[in-house]
Amino acid sequence: MPEDPPYMRDVVLGRGARIWQDIAQEPGIAEAIQHTLGHADLDRFSFTPNDRVWVFAYARAAQDNERMLRRLQQAGVREVVYITSSSTIIGDTTDCYEYPRVKRQAEAVALSLPQSRVLVLGLVVGHESELPAGRNAATLISEIARFMLAPQWPAGSERRKVLLRMVERPFGSPGERFAHTLYGRLLLACGRHPCLLRPLDLVLRALGLRWYGYTYLSNLLWSRSMTS
């Protein structure tokens, strides 16, 4: 990819995204981002060849995400940065969870476009204390803001950046630790069909626990990949 031009106009697509709304409060961001757009603005905004578009927008239909990314390509912007999720790592294991599946499909579309890059985020929180118990692939709001202000991409032709780290959080009780371990065994026993545990996920959610479902599987796979 050629070097950046002297001037780059930063544009955010997805101003309603919760993550972006939190990032927007970080020091320096308001001055750095010239425009923030919603879905409805995509077809009427005047993009320029000097634009770098940070895509926080997400649609549940894969074709809508593809249309959005191809519209940016057709607009002739300098660079598209698609914000994706660490949960896409589970795609080689199962496709039964909607969110990771759709994000993975959009990530593939983004990487098929020559001017696009992909930024992979973990569980996004303002502070580590907000993470679920256990080992988490996590990214702080402040870390995303710093990256947006001074992007550092991998050298060479690599266009995918993983911006996360593993963070260990304590369990609320020995009982929760036991439940976490047992849930993991059940999840792995389900093989490519972990969504069989969805009734149990609803129970865990009602109890205020947040480490179930694709969050558990994603954290497990990232933990393995970073220690192998």
Regions found by a protein language model. Name each.
Residues 167-218, 222, 227:
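Terminal hydrophobic/aromatic helix or amphipathic segment near a protein terminus
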Residues 97-120:
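Active-site Tyr-X1-5-Lys
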Residues 40-75, 86-94:
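NAD(P)H-binding glycine-rich loop region in Rossmannoid oxidoreductase-like domains
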Residues 137-178, 187:
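Alpha-helical substrate-binding/gating segment
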